[in-house]
Structures are given as C-alpha cells and as structure tokens.
C-alpha cells in the first residue's frame, strides 16, 4: 500500500473549487430586489474599482431615528448544497464625518437568510423580522470612509448551513447606517476530481459544517487493483482532500506511469508477475514475452520451470546423459560408477535413475523385484549404485538416467548412458534352517531345504558337526540329498550342526548353527511302548507347567507384586502374551546388564571400526563419525558414541542401556543400532550415520526452503516412528526436534532414548513415574508430566505437538524467550502457541488437539498418522492459513513485536529479530538508519544479498512492523 503521507502530499497540490450560485457583479440590468419600506434601500448604478458598470444598493437614513430598513434578494436554488458561502463587498460612511446628526447613526448592518421550498416570498411575507429570518451575523466594516476619502471597499465572507430546502433568500437589515452594498456573491465549495495513488475520486461538495468530512468513494484507475478496502478520501469544509483510506497498485502485467496516475502495460520482452508498485522486469534467462502486459515469461523451446518455481525463476533444461560409466562385476552383483553429465541444464538438483534389464538372446525385459539396489534405484544423489541378487551367467543392460527438477516437464525420456554386463558363476546361498527327524543314542537324522539361490546345479551338501563346547574337534560328512543320518555319536550329548551347499563355483555359506541332542543310552534300548507313557506324561506335565506359569504371570501383572527376579522373566514373556505384537523389554530389569546387551545388541569387533573425526560431545563421552567394515558387507559410515575414561559401573550400565533399548526397535523412522563394542576400550555404541544432523538446526539452516507438503512429510515420518514406539508400549519422554535426526534423503528418525522407560501394560492408560529430581524439558513436556512426573504415550503426543510447531516455524525456540516458570503459568491458564507464519489451519488445529489439557482426549499416534496422510492426499487443504484465532477455543500466546526505538543501531535490531548474519550486507549497502530500512523492498533485500525466501519474508514482515510503529509515533502532515 502507498504510505498515507505520500498520498496526502500528492493531493496537497490540488486546490479546492468554488462554484457560484449568484453574483451581482456581472449583472447589468436591474436586480429588482424587494426593499421594505420603500424609503429605505434603493438600487443605483455605479462602477467598480475597474470602472465596470455595476448595480448596487445603498441606504443612508442616518438623520432619522428608529430605522429598520430591509432588503431581500431573489430566490436562489440550493442545488444539493448543504452549506452556502456569501461574499459581501460594501462601504460604510464614518458617522463622525456626518455633521449635525440628530438621529442614531450606525456603522453596521445585519445579514439574514430564509429557506423555502419555492419562490413564494412577497412584499409582506415573510414578516420583516428575525425569526422567520435567520440571522447569520452582524456585519461591521474593517474601514469606513469620510467625505474627504473615496469609498473604501470592505469584503466579508460568511457562511451558513446546514440548509435542506429547495432554495433560500438573503436579507440585509439596516438600523441607521450609511451603507452601500456593492456586490453579493453566493457560492459553495467542493473538492475537485483528482487522481492519486492509482485511484480516481469524483468531484465532491463539502459538508454541512466547516469541520465536516465528506466521504468520497474511489475507484482504481484502469489496470489497477485495490490493495485494501474500502477505498476512499475525505473532503473537508475548505474543499481540500485529506485522510486517504486504502490504495490501489498496478495489476500484474502493468507498471506505474504518469506520476502514479495510470498503469501502463509491460512491453514485449518484459513482465510483472505480481500486483504492486514494482516496475516491469526483463524476462529471466531462456524465457520470452511475445505480447504486452505479460505476467510471466514463457520458457523457450526445450526449457522448463519446475512445479513451485516462481515467474522470476530462469527457465532450465534437462541434463545430458551421465558420462564415463564404469562397471565392476563380482559374481552376481555389479557396482556402477559414473561421472556427472557435461550439461546440467542450469540446475543443481540432478538425480540419477538406474534401469535394470535382463537380456535373453536379443530380447530384454525389466528385472524382477528380487534384484536389490543400494542405496536405491531411483532418485540417487551420489554417482555410485551397487546392484545385487542378479542371476548367474546372465546378460544385463543398465540404463543410467540423469534427471532434474524439470525432467518431468519434458515430453522426452531422460538422457541416459547404457552399459551391458554379464554376471559370473556364483556360489549358492546359505541353506535354510536345519531340522531334526529323529534322535537315538548314537545317531541323528536331519533334513533341510535347498538354498533359495542355488546359482547353478547343487553337487552335494557338507554337514559340519561337533559336540557343544568342543568346536575344535568337529567332523564333516557329505550328502547328495537334503537329508542325512549321522552315526557314531555319543549318547546324551548336545551337538552343534551347520550345513552348506556346493556347486562348481564352490561352497556357499554355512547355515545358522543349530543344536540337537542324542538320547541317553538306556532310552535307546527302551521299547516304543515303554517310551509312549513317558512322552505323554512329559508333554502333559509340560503343558500344566506352562499354563501355571502363564497364570502366575497374569496374576503378578494385575497385582503389581513382581520382584526384581520375576520382572526379568515376565517381561520377556510379554513377547508371547500379545499375538503378533512384540513388546518392549526394559533392560534395567535385568540383574546383569551385560545379558541385556547380549540379547538386544550385536557385538562388533574393534578391528572393523575406524574413527575419523569428533563431531560432538554427549552425556557419557564424545560422539564421532567413523566407518564400519564388516566381512561380506559394504563399508558404511556410522555414528559412534564413546564412554569416557574413568566411568563408574552405573555409568557403564546407563550407557549400554540405551543400546539395549535401540536394539529392540526395527522401523525406518527409528535410529538403527549397528552394534556395540564392549570387549575393548573405549566402550562404543554404533548407529547409522545421519548426514544432516539434528532436525532443529537443519531447519534453521534451510529456513523457508521447503514446501508445506515436504514439511508435512517430515512430520508424518516422525509420527510413524512414534506410532511404532507407542504400539510397543514405550514412552520416549524427551521427544523434541533436537532429538530427531535427518539423513541425506530427508528421512527423519527418532533418537536419544536416554530418558525413556518401559510402559506397563496392566491397564488401559499405562504410566511411568520418574524418580524425584529428574530433569524435565519443560517446553516440550505435558502439564501432567511436569506436575506429577507421570509420563504416558499421551504426554509424548503433547511433545509431538511442540515438534510440529518447531518444524512449521523452521526450528524456532518454543515459547521464544519466556522463562520456564512463565511457560508453566501460561499453559496452566490454557494459553497455547499461535500458528507459525504461513502454517496451514489444519496443522495448527492438530497441534491444539495434541495440547488438550485432558490427556484422554488427545489423539493417538495412529490417528495422527492417519490425519497427516489425509492432508498429504488432499493438498488443497494445506493452502488454507488462519492468521487469527477464529474457531480456536484456546487462547493463543502473542509474541510482542520488538519496538525498533529500543535499539540504538540497525545491527542491534537485526540481532533482535535473529537476522544478525546480514549486518554487513545492510551496512555495506548504506542501510544504516531506521528511516532507510523502513523504505526497503523485496528488490532491495535481493540486491544486498538476502536470497533465502524465508529470510526475505521475515525481514519484510519486520520492516512492515517498523513502518507501523513509525506511523503510530510520528505526526502525519496533512
């Protein structure tokens, strides 16, 4: 909108107009006004100061007392005027200059008017007196004249109103003066037609009072649109325009011209994409505008804009094919590497797709789903892909496509490079589980299924076995079938057995070790009839024992009377109490924490681990980035947590406890545990490496760079991970954006399980009561958890609502700079965080649902995932934003806009609004005072180097707040 002061200054040059209703100065014939009595006023001819003939009225009965001489004009039509102005030109004789006066000499006369709906006045009607005539004023001269002087003309202007009837008469009363009424001009004032700020305002008559303001509605000039409504100006009593309300700016495709009085079309080759005060701009690179008034420049042939790119963005093209493709075949896998295309299309978002085709003779078809790609098949960011699970001795053709953000706009398939390979002979895969088909004192009968991928003809199977605990004294036998009977075994002995297959390419991997036991020698000699009762009795006793154990466990759970030793076993049994659902087991219920680590975490040999650099510090020690290289697996980056030297046993237990927790989880949105190192120093926990680090800092570094759909996708991933945890009866207790990690593909994963605890399943709303004195992250924690230290999945839902707010505000601190106590007080008074800038209403409503005081009314994580899926499918619902509190039952906190006057310099102001990184940009460009900063536009920000859209929006909003504060504190000149 145009600033109000600017519009007023533009209008100040437009002078008010006067329109005459009657003027005796130009009358040359008789005026024929009515005089009473006949001996009073008389009409005479004379000359004005320019020697022009005029008709005047005069009276000079000063020698007679009790004078009451009246003069009335003809009927004057009102013409919709509410206030009338009368200009009187007259002369008055100085009474002292008249000799021998016997009467009462006056030097004034009275001025009246009378309203009427028609020209109905007569010589005796209305009565010649005040009321019905309405007195306007007593007219006194500024100067009178004597006999020696020439007549000195006085000019007086009087006004009266409001008048509402069809017309009026003017009347003059003489009470004994020597007066000459030279001319009478009757007129009214009006504000002239004007155009300013791309708006036209009609000619407007002033109001009924001198102080009246008459509203004149405005209309935008052609090709301009209203910025705010209503569009109007006020006409004051002097016929001057003032107090503009609303404004217009040129529409998209048009720019200002004629000193803001017209909008002209953009010329060919230029465009203007948005309504506003800006000028037309040359078309961006690789685009054109072939007609005038263009709002966007269309891309030239072969160039495109991606979805979401603005009209200001240059058009780009698809990349050329990848170059220098290298293939490295290893049996039934291949590693493909390539160099980037020679032409990237003017973009930096190049991705790669690897299309696999299996060729039989001359016919090639798409590979089946068994073929695996690492890291993935489509949308690969790095220039290396490993393809495995190919068939042996088979020809394959791989197309490596290069795509970017505009490839989907091109009608052509992406450019690609083709490489053909032939796989080698490979050894068979491992044998599935080995099973027992009979056990005697001196023999075992076993069977197994063939390998899933034989990769050729199976020649035979090798069976390796040894008595448990005597791995060095093993034996092997071979079999050409999938069964074997092994003789010469020791009675009542446990044997460990492994099987592997052999082809012409060699042996495959051994199966997983299985344990089988031969029976006692007496049992071997027993007859089948003797064994049946024993078997039946054993089975019956076993069933009774299992039922008894289950009943005991259920009773113990319901009464909560488990002791420490019982807890270890009953919690493990939970995995079997809920069909199809794996429940979390608290590692702190183990008497020996090392047993929990062995159960849930994989031990990794220290020789497989290489620490590269320290990237941070944790509660127990340093956090490092490193590499993990295990046999048969590709080298991978990992995050390594180390336990500092001089630790206590309790610290070691707590440190490894987090690994025991993570090892129980298997979900794409939960951080994955790779293993632990406990047999050497330092003790380590290895997890997958997340390239983009913590979510809060990642969002702050990429402020404004994601679409709403992408942000909702991030929220959906976090909710999916929390749904998985809640279904395992697991409470996180410390869910916050700082504890969400982001990988290179923007997949978010829940991490940091240091504060988490097991969630009991003995009632519908399980809780955990923390130890007194435990640290609680106030800004993310539900009120019941703060007050009573009770944590539930519902309190995790509250924390998830705060995470939603962090994501939509690009990592802003919840509750800003409020103290923890102020946060607690605000929540207790039912205040909730307002929607972040440009946050869709549906997302803020979901946040408010997560922050309901009654935890039983908060949504479950499964419901949150479902709600986010619906929003993603219906993207239109994400375009509705709610700037206010309409429809919101909770009160919303209001972050006060910092007053610029409290900051001594522009640099201090930038620091206060978290934009301190641009101090040098502002100062170098000359924006060193608040007066200059308040005039900045989006083009100015772009010119000084503020290129991030989110930062531009934040700065422009702060500049707008500064303008508002200036308008409220500085006087406006009218």
Curated annotation (Swiss-Prot):
Catalytic site: 734
Entry keywords, A to Z: ATP-binding, Cell membrane, Cell projection, Developmental protein, Disulfide bond, Glycoprotein, Kinase, Membrane, Neurogenesis, Nucleotide-binding, Phosphoprotein, Receptor, Repeat, Signal, Transferase, Transmembrane, Transmembrane helix, Tyrosine-protein kinase
Designated name of the protein: Ephrin type-B receptor 3
Residue stretches making up the SAM domain: 901-965
Keyword flag Transit peptide: no
Binding site for ATP: 615-623, 641
Leader sequence segment: 1-16
Domain of life: Eukaryota
UniProt-annotated glycosylation sites, renumbered to this chain: 330, 420
Family that this chain belongs to: Belongs to the protein kinase superfamily. Tyr protein kinase family. Ephrin receptor subfamily.
């Amino acid at each position: 909108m145009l600033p109000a002061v600017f519009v007023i200054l533009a209008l100040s040059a437009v002078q008010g107009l006067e329109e005459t209703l009657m003027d005796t100065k130009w009358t040359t014939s008789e005026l024929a006004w009515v005089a009473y009595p006949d001996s009073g006023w008389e009409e005479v001819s004379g000359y004005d100061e320019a020697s022009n003939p005029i008709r005047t009225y005069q009276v000079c009965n000063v020698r007679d007392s009790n004078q009451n001489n009246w003069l009335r004009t003809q009927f004057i039509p009102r013409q919709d005027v509410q206030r009338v102005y009368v200009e009187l030109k007259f002369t008055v004789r100085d009474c002292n200059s008249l000799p021998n006066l016997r009467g009462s000499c006056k030097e004034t006369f009275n001025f009246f008017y009378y309203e009427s709906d028609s020209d109905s006045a007569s010589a005796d009607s209305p009565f010649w007196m005040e009321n019905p005539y309405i007195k306007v004023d007593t007219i006194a001269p500024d100067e009178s004249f004597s006999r020696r002087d020439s007549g000195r003309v006085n000019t007086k202007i009087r006004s009266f109103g409001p008048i509402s009837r069809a017309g009026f008469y003017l009347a003059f009363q003489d009470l004994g003066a020597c007066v000459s009424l030279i001319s009478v001009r009757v007129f009214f004032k009006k504000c002239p037609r004007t155009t300013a700020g791309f708006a036209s305002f009609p000619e407007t008559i002033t109001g009924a009072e001198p102080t009246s303001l008459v509203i004149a509605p405005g209309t935008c000039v052609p090709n301009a649109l209203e910025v705010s409504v209503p569009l109007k100006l006020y006409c004051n009593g002097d016929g001057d325009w003032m107090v503009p309300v609303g404004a217009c700016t040129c529409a998209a495709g048009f720019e200002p011209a004629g000193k803001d009085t017209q909008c002209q079309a953009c010329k060919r080759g230029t465009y203007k994409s948005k309504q506003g005060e800006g000028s037309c701009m040359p078309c961006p690179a690789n685009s054109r505008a072939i007609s005038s008034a263009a709002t966007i420049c269309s891309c030239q042939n072969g160039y495109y804009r991606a979805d979401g790119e603005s009209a200001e963005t240059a058009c780009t093209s698809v990349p050329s094919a990848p170059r220098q493709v290298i293939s490295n075949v290893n049996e039934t896998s291949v590693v493909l590497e390539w160099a980037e295309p020679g032409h990237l299309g003017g973009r930096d978002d190049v991705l790669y797709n690897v299309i696999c085709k299996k060729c039989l003779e001359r016919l090639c078809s798409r590979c089946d789903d068994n073929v695996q790609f690492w890291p993935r098949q489509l949308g690969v960011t790095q220039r290396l892909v490993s393809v495995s699970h190919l068939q042996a001795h088979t020809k394959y053709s791989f197309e490596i496509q290069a795509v970017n953000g505009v490839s989907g706009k091109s009608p052509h398939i992406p450019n690609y490079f083709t490489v053909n390979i032939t796989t080698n002979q490979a050894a068979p895969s491992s044998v599935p589980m080995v099973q027992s088909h009979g056990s005697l004192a001196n023999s075992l009968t076993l069977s197994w299924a063939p390998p899933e991928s034989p990769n050729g003809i199976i020649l035979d199977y090798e069976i390796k076995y040894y008595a448990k605990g005597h791995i060095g004294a093993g034996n092997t036998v071979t079999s050409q079938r999938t069964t074997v009977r092994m003789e010469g075994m020791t009675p009542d002995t446990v044997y460990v057995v492994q099987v592997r297959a052999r082809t012409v390419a060699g042996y495959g991997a051994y199966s997983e070790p299985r344990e089988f036991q031969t029976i006692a020698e007496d049992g071997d000699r027993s007859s089948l009839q003797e064994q049946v009762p024993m078997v039946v009795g054993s089975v019956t006793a076993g069933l009774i024992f299992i039922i008894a154990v289950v009943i005991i466990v259920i009773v113990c759970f319901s009464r909560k009377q488990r002791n420490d030793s019982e807890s270890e076993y009953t919690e493990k049994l939970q995995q079997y109490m809920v069909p199809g659902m794996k429940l979390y087991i608290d590692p702190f219920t183990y008497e020996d924490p090392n047993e929990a680590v062995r159960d849930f975490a994989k031990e990794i040999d220290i020789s497989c681990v290489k620490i590269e650099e320290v990237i941070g510090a944790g509660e127990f020690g340093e956090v490092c980035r490193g590499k993990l290289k295990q046999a048969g697996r590709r080298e991978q980056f990992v995050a390594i947590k180390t336990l500092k030297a001089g630790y206590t046993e309790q610290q070691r237990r707590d440190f490894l406890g987090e690994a025991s927790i993570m090892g129980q989880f298997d979900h794409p949105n939960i951080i994955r545990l790779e293993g632990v190192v406990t047999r050497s120093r330092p003790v380590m926990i290895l997890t997958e490496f997340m390239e983009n680090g913590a979510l809060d800092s990642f969002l702050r570094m990429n402020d404004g760079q994601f679409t709403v759909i992408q942000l909702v996708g991030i929220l959906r991933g976090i909710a999916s991970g929390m749904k998985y945890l809640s279904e395992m009866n697991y409470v996180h207790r410390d869910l916050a954006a700082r504890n969400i990690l982001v990988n290179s593909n923007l997949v978010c994963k829940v991490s940091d399980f240091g504060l988490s605890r097991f969630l009991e399943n003995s009632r519908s709303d399980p809780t955990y009561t923390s130890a007194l004195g435990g640290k609680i992250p106030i800004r993310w924690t539900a009120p019941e958890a703060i007050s009573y230290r009770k944590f539930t999945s519902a309190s995790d839902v509250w924390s998830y609502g705060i995470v939603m707010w962090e994501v939509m505000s690009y990592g802003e601190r919840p509750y800003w700079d409020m103290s923890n106590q102020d946060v607690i007080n605000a929540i207790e008074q039912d205040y909730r965080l307002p929607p972040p800038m440009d946050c869709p209403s549906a997302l803020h409503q979901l946040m408010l649902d997560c922050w309901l005081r009654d935890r039983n009314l908060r949504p479950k994580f499964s419901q949150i995932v479902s709600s986010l899926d619906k929003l993603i499918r219906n993207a239109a619902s994400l375009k509705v934003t709610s700037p206010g509190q309409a429809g919101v039952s909770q009160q919303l906190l209001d972050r006060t806009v910092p007053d610029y006057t409290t900051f001594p310099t522009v640099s201090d102001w930038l620091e206060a609004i978290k934009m301190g990184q641009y101090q040098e940009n502002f100062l170098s460009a000359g924006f060193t005072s608040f007066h200059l900063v308040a005039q900045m536009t989006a083009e100015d920000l772009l010119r000084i180097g503020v290129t991030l859209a989110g930062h531009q929006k934040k700065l422009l909003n702060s500049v707008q707040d500064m303008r508002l504060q200036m308008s409220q504190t500085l006087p406006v000149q009218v």
